[in-house]
């Protein structure tokens, strides 16, 4: 079970006790089975998902989702699967109330199976779409992740969640958010997004990346030959075949972030967090200092003992620097006028993530299972002294 904490002043802090997809946590959120469908152009959404999936004849495709507000999407996707000459395996429901036509011989064969058997049954699924309401707490979802770890198949993560108020509380997925996400899916320039991410990856290779914030964060690292996962919306089989880790085969839509586990021994410096919750207690001015990728000191104006207890309870993973991520999608940026909110997990252009814990899904060397995500919305990022992000704004 994932547990989520999110706090924002100059940064966002998201904590999870298990690895998974970007939005696969079981955080408190509006029920996907009861929220109105108003504002969602399902035909447009289905078209984008199918285009990004780029199905080939005879590929076997499974949908995984929660019965409810996204029911109208399912027949559109299944029709598209068949139109591409692929094989529709049906829809695995992660909750009660599924329409009868979701079930197929394939999905019925999954009922009651243990995790090992599920992995075997799913091993010849070429593509799965993880739709709203599905997450890593569901057995079929988790088993499909294991298939991906074995360098087989691919998935689209399409959760329609991750909207936050600026104070860090979850924002309802209302008609405004629905319209916003539909536009982002349809209007993202996927080619330009991919080009920007490739350029940044090339800049990082052989260089020193430095992240600073006005609160005092100042940390540097190198990525060596580590895989850089580019969430550019390409969910094709050809792209999955080039994947080097689990998340290369898990494609997020909406798209926008790059993710990398730096060479652990290269990580050095300080991360200063905003007021946030650690070990169920509020902390202020929490400051962690890292040498060779490992936390060597912890200070805080308030809550130091609670933060240290959480970190020590996680073992070595709790003290390890996990990940650097950077958002590139300008359409997911925090709005500069009107209502200001954080779209899709803060993955808009210029948002940085500096995380702690297990980075094996990224191709890193730190295990242990513990993961704490920390999003910063005012960071400056330089690569060998060249500025790419300034004060939370992508400038290249």
Give the predicted meaning of each segment:
Residues 1-8:
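Bacterial N-terminal signal peptides that target proteins for export
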Residues 12, 19-270, 278:
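Active-site bordering "gate/hinge" segments
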Residues 68-69, 134-135, 216, 226, ...:
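Short, glycine-/Ser/Thr-/acidic-enriched flexible segments
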Residues 202-204, 264, 279-282, 317, ...:
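Short solvent-exposed loop/turn micro-motifs enriched in small/polar/acidic residues
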Residues 211, 289, 381:
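Short aromatic-centered micro-motifs
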Residues 268, 281, 297-364:
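Dual-mode signal for accessory low-complexity, basic/Gly-rich regions
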Residues 283-299:
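Active-site and channel-lining beta-strand-loop segments
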Residues 351-396:
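Intrinsically disordered terminal and processing segments
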């Amino acid at each position: 079970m994932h547990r989520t904490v999110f706090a924002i002043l100059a940064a966002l802090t998201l904590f999870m006790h298990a690895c998974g997809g970007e939005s696969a946590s079981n955080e408190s959120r509006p029920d996907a089975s009861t929220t109105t469908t108003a504002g969602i152009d399902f035909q447009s959404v289905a078209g984008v998902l199918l285009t990004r999936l780029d199905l080939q004849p005879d590929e076997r495709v499974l949908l995984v989702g929660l019965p409810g507000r996204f029911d109208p999407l399912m027949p559109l996707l299944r029709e598209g699967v068949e139109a591409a000459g692929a094989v529709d395996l049906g829809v695995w429901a992660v909750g009660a109330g599924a329409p009868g036509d979701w079930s197929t011989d394939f999905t019925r064969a999954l009922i009651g199976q243990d995790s090992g058997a599920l992995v075997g049954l799913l091993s010849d699924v070429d593509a799965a779409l993880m739709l709203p309401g599905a997450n890593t707490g569901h057995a079929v979802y988790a088993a499909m992740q294991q298939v991906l770890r074995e360098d087989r198949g691919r998935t689209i993560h399409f959760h329609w969640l991750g909207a936050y108020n600026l104070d860090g509380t979850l924002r309802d997925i209302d008609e405004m958010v629905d319209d916003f996400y539909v536009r982002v899916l349809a209007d993202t320039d996927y080619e330009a997004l991919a080009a920007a991410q490739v350029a940044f990856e090339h800049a990082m290779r052989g260089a020193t990346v430095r992240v600073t914030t006005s609160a005092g964060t100042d940390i540097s690292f190198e990525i060596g030959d580590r895989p850089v996962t580019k969430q550019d919306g390409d969910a094709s089989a050809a792209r999955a075949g080039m994947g080097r880790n689990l998340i290369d085969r898990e494609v997020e839509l909406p798209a926008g972030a790059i993710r990398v586990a730096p060479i652990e021994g290269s990580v050095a410096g300080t991360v200063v967090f905003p007021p946030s919750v650690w070990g169920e207690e509020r902390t202020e001015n929490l400051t962690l200092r890292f040498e060779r990728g490992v936390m060597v000191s912890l200070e805080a104006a308030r809550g130091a003992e609670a933060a240290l207890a959480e970190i020590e309870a996680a073992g070595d993973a709790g003290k390890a620097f996990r990940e650097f991520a950077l958002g590139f999608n300008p359409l997911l940026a925090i709005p500069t006028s009107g209502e200001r909110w954080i779209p899709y997990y803060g993955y808009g252009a210029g948002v940085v993530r500096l995380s702690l814990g297990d980075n094996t899904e990224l191709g890193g060397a730190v295990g242990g299972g513990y993961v704490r995500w920390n999003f910063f919305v005012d960071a400056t990022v330089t690569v060998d002294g060249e500025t790419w992000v300034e004060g939370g704004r992508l400038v290249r």
